């Protein structure tokens, strides 16, 4: 037998292992799908969950914290499946059974034997007892979480349900519940006392006399309970949790339905009826309580509980009272419920508002829930005739509940109870008139099936007429009242109430006769779907109506003749959307409409639904692709899939669409609007028309900007498929909407027009555009420019849309020489000439005023030549000039010029793109070229002189968008543009210094640089110049000028309130320089294959020499060591590409290229990330061994080492330590590297900038703290002068920056390190200068905090207090001054001790500095001390002062102290330079 058990165990273990392997295989196979769809397809943490549960029940936790951590992890894993709980089903038994067994063996049985800790054979320690109690408590908690995620109905089925378990579990439930109630009472009482105490009420008057003696006991015994509840109740093993009571009640609810009499389990239950004679409580004297009476008594108490305990006891009571042997108790319980409801209603009517009102509401909720569950699960005949008194009391109490503030919960339970009462009142037979789908025989045709259905319906109607009349007579009047209440709730504001009402409608109508049921359905259709679904409809009513119709359809109660009315309503509901300002309402309505479509698909036969199938499916496809909300798209996809599956062959291309546009793929909005649109658009007969109609009439005008942009892209893709239909049917409808008063309509129409034109250009279908359409599009620009909305709110979107239209117009090359003033609107008459003349005169006056204003502020105004001639000619020529201004080209030019000066960055970029295309397409005539030259000159002046930042930003963008190739600009003009752009990058004047202008200028220099390189390669191929002539060419010099400019731009470290904005310039400059290198290498390869006879090889080495490459690489390494992760990532990726460039010709003049390739390998780890400093910095620091990269890289690392981020400092230090540890095997090389590293530090201190002073001080201190460099200072080596010079440089820096408090505070640690660490060393220079630096900081009269910290460092010294000169008193005097003086006091209190200290330490230089830098108001000082003896006497007798001096200066000193205290505020002395503040 044992062998067989072993074999079975081994086989089970093998099966478990195989299942784990299979699970791992499933995980690997489903991993890709799970990542793509963001949906879980299996419980990935199942093995971990099993291990944690096993560890919990076997009490393997070593301490309480570990147990809490593991429990938290278990709960976290389970909570992840809250939206997909069914994935847990296969694991539930493996989780719940061990937990229930653990609770049963260690808690239930032990508790009933009163031997929780003493019956075990081994004595448990206190820690083990705590672990056991907390493990039991956490087991209950885990089971509750499972019930929350998966539902208690599923979880409770897995509990143990042996009859023998009933009494032990019930006993433990009673114990646990009473403990829970007592704990809550004690907490409430203590809370009341604490609130009264804080309110100032006398506790002696508040506490009753009989309670006074108990108060100390309560405080002593239960204060711990209350405190633990406030801190962390759920992890206190001595406190009963509500989860325990909840789970035990569910367990008893399973055990009470055992098919045995309670008397067979408990002798006290033999007299159940007599015991329950008084309401079933069994409280008679000397009488044993039965099981039922115990449960009833406990349940009635728990129905008013505020927690989830109420729900579990409601389930328990409903199952208990529905037992066949509990008829009497059931009637008594209903009677008790009626009396309780009446009592609560009477208290409310008598205005008896007291503290028990909340308990009354909770009790009513518990009663309603119990009755509803009992009516649902019980036998209908047991409740007949229904207690009308109960019904009346429930309807009366509804008014009280609606005013209680808990309407949502109570009304839901109220509706559930009402529908159950109605179901009991009605006959229990389902409606014979409902539609029932027949199974279609294989050989029958659809027409024959319709005939059969009609015959069946007619026969049923004839046979059931008399029965229907009888049923109508038997319908109680209360059903009308219930239906009226439910119909009102269909419009409720809460979704959960509408859902409950919809289900109630379906259940009740299913029991009604046909006439009455048809009336209810008619009311739903007429009352719920009122008004327009886009303007003024009630979203709640539409949502409730869709849900109700769906529930009716599922049950076949929506007869086929109603589909003619229902289907149009469904289609309207699929697109329900009401705009409310910056948002819209209607997603829940659209979702419910998809649910209704799903219900229709499941209910009706093909022959019934076929006339409506195609319109429903088409609209479902539209919703699944283009709805804004992901849940609506997925619901529509699921409904469409149901249509295809249930009605195979009737949905055109259904299988193809379902497989491509499935439930998961429509979840991605971009994918739906792009790739799926292209796929659906191929079905031009069935789906293309409705898709393009929806996009062109609804979606491009959506209130959401992102939807408008995506919809315009979809129209672009559909135009590729059927351009003729778009141009002829939809473009004429879209163009007029550019003149709408709504911003989102104007913007959407502009985007759609632009995308349509671009699509026509890409597919060579421009000929489809008629002249009329072209003129309509051109007129939109003219009309929009003159609108008020253009310059008001939303003007940015309109400008962007118009710029996109202009870009597309230039792309398809419209004729822009036409005079738009000659084009009249269809409704326009000739009588408007007077208005046109007045408008023209007004425009002329405005232009003159602008010109006058611009001349006064020395601002160039950009106008076309026609406008300039207007201002210079006589008034007789005004009309001709105005007509010139109406030419399309001039209108577009002026429009784009205006947008270039707009403050919005996106408007400027779109305008510059349109400008570039405008001149490249329309620059053929000399007049246009001269206009271009004027424009360039004007924008160069704007970039140089205009103080308007927006204008300079636009000008810097435009100068890079010039048509260099088509205009054949001269070298002088090109050089002028380059010089102005370079000047804008290095502006020092705050009025002209602008980060956006610098970024735009660099982008423009990139375009110009590419154009110049093209010229160089082109000229070299044509002329084949010698290398010397090539180096002397103007174009090459201009390119080198741009290269050097961008190299200098990498030093931009500007800071403003947005942070390190200079990083934008540094990043872009590096990218542009790298793009230049890539362009040269690419063209070098192409030129070598085409021109073999060239005397000069335009290689990368000739165009960019070794010095330029080295400087660029050094700069990249410097940026790679800086603190910004993004800059590091960009710089390191450029270095990697430069080293491993894949072109045939690589860059050979990179210093130490082969060694660098060994460090920065070609194929890095998949998970490697330059952003993570713990991975990137160790790799970067390996480059420190190359001397040419040492200084720049270390300079960049100082930004990280001296930063304020702790993790960045630690990673930098660890990386440098790791770098030096790589030379541990070679002491000589290690020594050399440390020397070179130290020299680099010295060079940095010699050349440090104001920006890097503070990071340099912090970096040197952090480096010295590693103790790597100590031997250079301790040993008498020649190299010790390096750190002596570093110390001297640091001293000079703080001596010249005495007003920079942040620098002074950061320098204290550095100088104290030199002073304390090396005070016992023989290096007198280090000791003297570090002491001198600390004394200099101590002498700072401006910042008390600096003096305080400096004095704290001096107190750590031992050298100052040791007698080295034979003088016994000097060290003690120094110690007395340092320790006894409060150095953060006011200046007048510390000035004398300070001078005395400096005199004792022979720091005459610092004494001179004190006299040269007095305080703001002179402080009366004592007569000068001329000897050491006099000083000693003064220190030993500090109170020996002249009385006259004190009396005469008393008032003056008080005034001085007051003034000094006022003037020495910290905020008044902060540095004015914001860069210093940003560094901190």
Curated annotation (Swiss-Prot):
Region feature Disordered, mapped onto this chain: 1-32, 453-476, 859-880, 1437-1480
Which spans does this entry mark as compositional bias, Acidic residues? 464-476, 1469-1480
* Comp. bias (Low complexity): 7-32, 453-463, 1444-1468
InterPro entries reported for this sequence:
ARM-like, ARM-type_fold, HEAT_type_2, TBCD, Tubulin_specific_chaperoneD_C
Source organism, top-level taxon: Eukaryota
Any one GO MF annotation of this record: beta-tubulin binding
Give residue ranges of the HEAT repeats: 482-520, 886-922
GO BP terms: namely: microtubule cytoskeleton organization; post-chaperonin tubulin folding pathway; protein folding; tubulin complex assembly
Keywords (A to Z) from UniProt: Chaperone, Repeat
Report whether DNA repair shows up as a keyword of the record. no
* Family, as annotated: Belongs to the TBCD family.
Q: Per its database record, what is this protein's job?
A: Tubulin-folding protein; involved in the first step of the tubulin folding pathway.
Q: How does it assemble?
A: Supercomplex made of cofactors A to E. Cofactors A and D function by capturing and stabilizing tubulin in a quasi-native conformation. Cofactor E binds to the cofactor D-tubulin complex; interaction with cofactor C then causes the release of tubulin polypeptides that are committed to the native state.
Task: Indicate what this protein is called per its UniProt record.
Answer: Tubulin-specific chaperone D
Q: Which organism is it from?
A: Dictyostelium discoideum (Social amoeba)
């Amino acid at each position: 037998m044992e062998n067989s058990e072993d074999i079975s165990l081994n086989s089970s273990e093998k099966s478990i292992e195989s299942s784990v392997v299979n699970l791992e295989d499933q995980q690997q196979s489903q991993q890709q799908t799970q990542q793509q769809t963001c949906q879980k397809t299996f419980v990935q943490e199942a093995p971990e969950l099993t291990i944690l549960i096993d560890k919990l029940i076997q009490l393997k936790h070593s301490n309480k914290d570990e147990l809490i951590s593991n429990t938290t992890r278990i709960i976290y894993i389970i909570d992840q499946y809250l939206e997909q709980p069914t994935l847990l089903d296969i694991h539930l038994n493996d989780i719940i059974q061990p937990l229930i067994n653990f609770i049963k063996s260690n808690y239930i049985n032990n508790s009933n034997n009163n031997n929780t800790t003493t019956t075990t054979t081994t004595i448990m320690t206190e820690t083990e007892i705590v672990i056991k109690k907390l493990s039991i408590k956490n087991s209950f908690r885990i089971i509750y979480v499972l019930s929350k995620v998966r539902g208690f109905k599923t979880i409770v089925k897995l509990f143990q349900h042996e009859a023998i378990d009933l009494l032990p579990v019930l006993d433990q439930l009673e114990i646990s519940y009473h403990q829970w109630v007592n704990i809550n009472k004690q907490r409430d009482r203590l809370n009341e006392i604490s609130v009264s105490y804080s309110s100032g009420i006398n506790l002696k008057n508040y506490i009753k006399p009989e309670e006074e003696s108990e108060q100390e006991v309560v405080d002593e015994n239960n204060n711990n309970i209350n405190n633990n509840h406030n801190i962390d109740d759920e992890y206190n093993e001595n406190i009963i949790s509500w989860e325990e009571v909840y789970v035990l009640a569910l367990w008893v609810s399973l055990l009470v339905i055992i098919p045995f009499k309670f008397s067979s389990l408990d002798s006290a239950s033999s007299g159940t009826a007599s015991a329950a004679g008084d309401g079933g409580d069994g409280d008679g004297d000397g009488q044993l309580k039965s099981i039922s009476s115990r449960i009833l008594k406990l349940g009635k108490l728990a129905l008013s509980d505020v927690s989830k305990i109420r729900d579990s006891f409601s389930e328990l009571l409903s199952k208990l009272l529905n037992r066949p042997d509990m008829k009497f108790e059931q009637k008594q319980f209903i009677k008790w419920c009626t009396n309780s409801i009446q009592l609560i209603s009477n208290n409310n009517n008598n205005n008896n508002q007291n503290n028990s009102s909340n308990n009354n509401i909770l009790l009513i909720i518990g009663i309603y829930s119990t009755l509803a569950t009992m009516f649902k699960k019980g036998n209908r005949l047991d409740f007949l005739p229904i207690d009308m008194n109960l019904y009346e009391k429930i309807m009366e109490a509804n008014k009280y509940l609606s005013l209680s503030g808990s309407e949502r919960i109570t009304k839901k339970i109220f509706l559930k109870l009402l529908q159950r009462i109605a179901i009991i009142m009605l006959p229990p037979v389902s409606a014979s008139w409902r539609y029932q789908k027949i199974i279609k025989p294989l050989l029958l045709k659809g027409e024959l099936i319709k005939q059969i259905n009609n015959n069946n319906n007619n026969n049923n109607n004839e046979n059931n007429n008399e029965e229907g009349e009888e049923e109508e007579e038997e319908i109680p009047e209360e059903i009308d009242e219930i239906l009226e209440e439910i119909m009102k709730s269909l419009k409720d504001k809460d979704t959960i109430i509408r859902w409950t009402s919809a289900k109630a409608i379906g259940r009740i109508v299913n029991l009604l006769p046909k006439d009455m049921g048809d009336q209810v359905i008619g009311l739903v259709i007429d009352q719920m779907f009122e008004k327009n679904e886009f303007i003024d409809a009630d979203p709640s009513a539409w949502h409730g109506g869709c849900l109700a119709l769906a529930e009716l359809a599922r049950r076949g109660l929506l007869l086929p003749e109603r589909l003619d009315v229902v289907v149009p309503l469904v289609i309207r509901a699929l697109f329900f959307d009401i705009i409310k300002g910056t948002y819209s309402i209607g997603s829940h309505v659209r979702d419910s409409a998809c649910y209704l479509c799903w219900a229709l698909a499941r209910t009706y036969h093909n022959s019934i639904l076929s006339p409506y199938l195609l319109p429903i499916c088409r609209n479902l496809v539209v919703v699944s692709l283009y709805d804004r909300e992901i849940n609506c798209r997925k619901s529509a996809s699921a409904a469409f899939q149901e249509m295809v599956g249930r009605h195979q062959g009737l949905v055109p291309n259904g299988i193809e669409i379902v497989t491509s546009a499935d439930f998961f793929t429509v979840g991605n909005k971009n994918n739906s609007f792009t790739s799926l649109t292209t796929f659906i658009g191929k079905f031009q007969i069935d789906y293309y028309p409705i898709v393009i109609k929806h996009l062109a009439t609804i979606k491009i005008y959506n209130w959401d900007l992102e939807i408008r942009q995506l919809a315009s892209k979809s129209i672009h893709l559909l135009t590729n498929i059927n351009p003729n239909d778009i141009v002829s049917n939809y473009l004429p409808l879209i163009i007029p909407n550019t003149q709408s008063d709504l911003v989102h309509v104007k913007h959407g129409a502009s985007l759609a027009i632009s995308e349509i034109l671009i699509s026509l250009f890409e597919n060579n279908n421009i000929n489809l555009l008629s002249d009329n359409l072209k003129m309509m599009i051109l007129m939109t620009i003219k009309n929009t420019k003159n609108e008020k909305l253009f310059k008001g709110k939303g003007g940015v979107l309109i400008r962007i849309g118009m710029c996109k239209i202009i870009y597309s117009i230039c792309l398809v090359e419209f004729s822009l020489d036409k005079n738009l003033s000659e084009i009249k609107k269809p409704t326009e008459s000739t009588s408007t000439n007077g208005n046109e003349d007045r408008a023209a005169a007004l425009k002329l006056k405005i232009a003159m005023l602008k010109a006058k204003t611009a001349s006064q502020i020395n601002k160039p105004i950009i106008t076309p030549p026609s406008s300039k001639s207007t201002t210079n000619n006589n008034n007789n020529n005004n009309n001709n000039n105005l007509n010139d201004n109406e030419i399309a080209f001039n209108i577009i030019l002026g429009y784009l010029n205006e947008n270039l000066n707009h403050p919005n960055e996106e408007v400027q970029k779109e305008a510059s793109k349109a400008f570039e295309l405008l001149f490249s397409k329309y620059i053929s005539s000399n007049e246009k070229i001269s206009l271009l030259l004027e424009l360039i000159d004007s924008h160069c002046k704007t970039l140089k002189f205009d103080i308007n930042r927006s204008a300079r930003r636009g000008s810097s963008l435009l100068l890079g968008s010039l048509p260099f190739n088509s205009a054949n600009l001269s070298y002088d003009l090109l050089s002028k543009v380059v010089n102005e752009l370079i000047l804008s990058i290095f502006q020092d004047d705050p009025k002209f210094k602008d980060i956006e202008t610098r970024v735009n200028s660099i982008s423009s220099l990139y375009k110009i640089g590419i154009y110049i390189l093209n010229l160089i390669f082109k000229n070299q191929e044509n002329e084949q110049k010698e290398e010397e002539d090539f180096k002397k060419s103007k174009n090459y010099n201009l390119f080198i000028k741009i290269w050097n400019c961008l190299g200098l731009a990498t030093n931009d470290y500007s800071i403003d309130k947005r942070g390190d904005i200079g990083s934008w310039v540094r990043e872009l400059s590096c990218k542009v320089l790298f793009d230049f290198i890539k362009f040269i290498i690419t063209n070098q390869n192409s030129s070598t294959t085409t021109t073999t006879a060239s005397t000069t090889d335009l290689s990368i080495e000739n165009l960019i020499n070794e010095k330029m490459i080295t400087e660029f690489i050094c700069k990249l390494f410097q940026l790679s060591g800086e603190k910004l992760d993004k800059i590091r990532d960009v710089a390191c990726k450029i270095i990697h590409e430069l080293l491993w460039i894949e072109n045939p010709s690589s860059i050979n003049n990179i210093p130490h290229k082969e060694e660098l390739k060994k460090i920065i390998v070609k194929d890095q780890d998949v998970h490697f990330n330059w952003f993570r400093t713990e991975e990137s910095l160790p790799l970067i620091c390996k480059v420190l061994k190359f001397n040419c990269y040492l200084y720049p890289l270390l300079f960049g690392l100082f930004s990280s080492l001296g930063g304020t981020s702790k993790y960045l400092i630690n990673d930098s230090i660890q990386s440098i330590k790791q770098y030096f540890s790589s030379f541990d095997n070679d002491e000589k090389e290690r020594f050399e590297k440390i020397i070179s590293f130290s020299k680099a530090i010295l060079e940095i201190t010699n050349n440090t900038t104001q920006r890097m002073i503070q990071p340099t001080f912090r970096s040197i201190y952090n480096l010295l703290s590693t103790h790597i460099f100590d031997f250079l200072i301790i040993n008498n080596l020649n190299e010790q002068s390096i750190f002596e010079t570093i110390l001297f440089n640091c001293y000079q820096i703080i001596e010249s920056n005495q007003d920079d408090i942040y620098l002074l505070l950061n320098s204290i640690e550095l100088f104290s390190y030199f002073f304390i660490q090396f005070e016992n060393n023989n290096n007198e220079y280090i000791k003297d200068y570090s002491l001198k630096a600390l004394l200099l900081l101590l002498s700072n009269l401006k910042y008390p905090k600096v003096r305080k910290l400096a004095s704290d460092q001096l107190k750590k010294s031992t050298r100052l207090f040791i007698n080295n000169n034979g003088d016994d008193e000097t060290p003690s005097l120094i110690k007395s001054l340092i320790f006894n003086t409060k150095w953060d006091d006011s200046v007048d209190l510390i000035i004398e001790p300070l001078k005395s200290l400096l005199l004792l330490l022979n720091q005459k230089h610092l004494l001179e500095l004190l006299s040269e830098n007095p305080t703001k108001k002179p402080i009366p000082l004592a007569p000068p001390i001329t000897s050491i003896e006099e000083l000693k006497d003064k220190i030993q007798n500090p109170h020996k002062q002249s009385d006259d001096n004190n009396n005469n200066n008393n008032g003056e000193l008080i005034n001085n102290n007051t003034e000094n205290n006022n003037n020495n505020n910290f905020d008044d002395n902060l540095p004015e330079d914001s860069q210093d503040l940003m560094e901190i």
